[in-house]
């Protein structure tokens, strides 16, 4: 230690230079750090999506979902497998253990799916990773005062999208509501009859002609060359002029087609049909131009609807790359849009969802809290030291420690987010502690009349004297955060950047206190250090110290009374716990709202549009609504993935009063006017909905769980502290099954697949082919009449052509069987399940959860039905358990560090008695401020373990020193108490002052590092500091009697 201080005092210029370099590097690092809302948390989820056209949910569940589930459920690290089977599609979500490498998991899942046998019509499964980065960071609405939607689409697709995709950090640009150009193809039924053709034969001819087949390498002379057969239909004109063989030429092909039966023969049929075209050209077989039997036209239509404030618009979603800076990407996109607007008259844009705004606001608010906190701390130090030079030396550690922390964080590629900024706000009061203790000791000894040392020797010895207590207190505070890394899961990942920031800042503050502080003290107090001691009263204990000395002496003489009072206060504070209640995280208020509309089964797109328009009108008539933007029919996962689902983004004015009440009222009004599907309020913020209570009901079938789900739903709807209660029970819609009469079919030379093909042509299907126009490929789609059927009779009357050319009604060869089917089939770990969710409106989530659980426990349900909790109640139980274990581990680590530092077990044991009394102030603080015991309050309690122990260390270290000098234990305690009172109070009050802006809960900021954390630390620090000054000396004096060795032999 002597060598370090001597080096610093001899090489002041080198220390100054190093300080300047570190300051500049820290400022540069801080200005160039990525800004995010929360740390990039690993989301251990994979989603497997499979499309199975034309299949009902039950078919999808049996033929696609089940084989996929079986393939992945036993993979390494799989925790839960949840699946939902819809019409035409399957979605399987795999939840892994948090420790799982998700890149490896994706590879393993892909390998497992290679061996799965799926129906021929099912598409290959697609695997995607769930990530917060897969959500848009910007949702934009663009419109034009000058151009129509067609021209605006051209502007957006041809120019704007490419410009936005070119911005660094943009992963994808998703467009909705634009007009899509395609070729529409509709058959002329009378002409088909005239030429003896049917739709299937014509389609096969077109698809068979429009193929490109590589034939491999052929040898020509001495060279090998590739040969390719190309039948590409290049243009719309080519398609119209295409020749189709008429009945006489195609009868053989039709016969072959009809006998082939299954769809697996389709490729052969297409090739055969194409061969007939070639044959007809050489043998003069009669043909007809395609344009004579079908109407082919170039059309422009909007695949999805996008509207903003009642006008047609185009929606644009910006998704950023994983490693990109949200704020930078959003700013660059907005700058590009501003430039595009200047270049295109009439072009307008607005952002309905901007994830950069809350990030910027959180960063600015946290910075302001940090600055105010630093000012409070400086004022408090100045009031105690009453010396400007000493104050300046102390507070230099605040900016320098934080800049060093920023420098290290940037090197580790940790972003500037609410966790790192919150840690700095919290650390401000603590990083100054070491410097205060050192400078206070230098300043105190400098003013002592009987101080034998002067100059460098005094600075060196005064710094050295305090090195052990400040080192052990810093190590203890750092050690408290080590168990957070062991917590694992989302909490662990969320708080690791928080813990690292505090660790780096405190480590930096320790180094500064033994290098820069003694150097500055020697420079600024040169005259005082080299001259005679300053005439002052400081060598005598102050008035406050004398009062404390008398109180401590009384407490030591009346140990039982003092201890009983302290214990009663502790037990009394525990009765506040039920009154305070518990929650996961406090709610975060952004003046935006997201609504989704899920149509009921069988609801048409037109009906869904009417529902959306009614909601739009209600929203536009609301006071304080700034922007209403919605998209419908985009099939967005955010809108539930339904092809006719709608997603609304509503932006309110920033000064909207009672926003929570407004959200509830507007949702109720929209739900009231809707007589079809389901309206829900969603939360797409980075933190999600923190107060959603969920119950899962499992059973063997949906019929088994239906009654139990409805009972739970009723219980939750009757609870006044719950809103937006919904169940995941699937709806049902009518199903018509065409049962083929095989005997009749075989007599007519028909197959069941021909019935399927004829009926399938009425539903959406893959494009027939593609053609080129202006360098772009356009899909050729057969015009369907899906919405135009009045009853199932219309389908029964549809005709198919037999092998002999005879037209047969479908109703003559198949009977219709009426039934019903679920719109979804949901399973979790192989069991059918439905969830019931509700949003808790009360701060006391645990009380609401307990009240509902009590009623659910009384429910009478079948033996094969089970109920499980999820949502916020499961989150609270999980996080509180993990943090409780982290606290126990932190206490064990602290004790170990103290034993090593003091070289014995008794003094550290006495120091630990400062911990229980933090609970008193923490609970009183939460109760008075109206906060709940939440995740951030628990983190505050964890921090207190490190902070309060430091005060006891400073006190007991002085006691041991004085015992070594020959004082009795009582005398040493009284002397140490009066001497160490000022640095203990200074460090405690400086920490409290730094946290006051956080505890006052200024507007904005973060959910995690918020008022609850500030209040917990301030309250706990007040109670523990006051009781530490009495209880720790009492425990130390009692334990001193048990020591076998003489006083003062513990290592100094």
UniProtKB/Swiss-Prot annotation:
Superkingdom classification of source: Bacteria
GO molecular function, one term: xenobiotic transmembrane transporter activity
One GO cellular component term: plasma membrane
InterPro entries in alphabetical order: AcrB_DN_DC_subdom (IPR027463), Acrflvin-R (IPR001036)
Induction text: Not induced by surfactin.
BP terms from Gene Ontology: response to antibiotic
Alphabetically ordered keywords of this record: Antibiotic resistance
Record keyword Disulfide bond present: no
Any single Pfam family the record assigns to this protein: ACR_tran
Family in the record: Belongs to the resistance-nodulation-cell division (RND) (TC 2.A.6) family.
Chain's role: Required for self-resistance to surfactin, an antimicrobial lipopeptide surfactant produced by B.subtilis. Also required for swarming motility.
UniProt xrefs under PANTHER family: PTHR32063, SWARMING MOTILITY PROTEIN SWRC
Note: A SwrC-deficient strain is susceptible to acriflavine and ethidium bromide, and showed severer growth inhibition as surfactin concentration increased up to 100ug/ml.
Name this polypeptide is given: Swarming motility protein SwrC
Species per Swiss-Prot/TrEMBL record: Bacillus subtilis (strain 168)
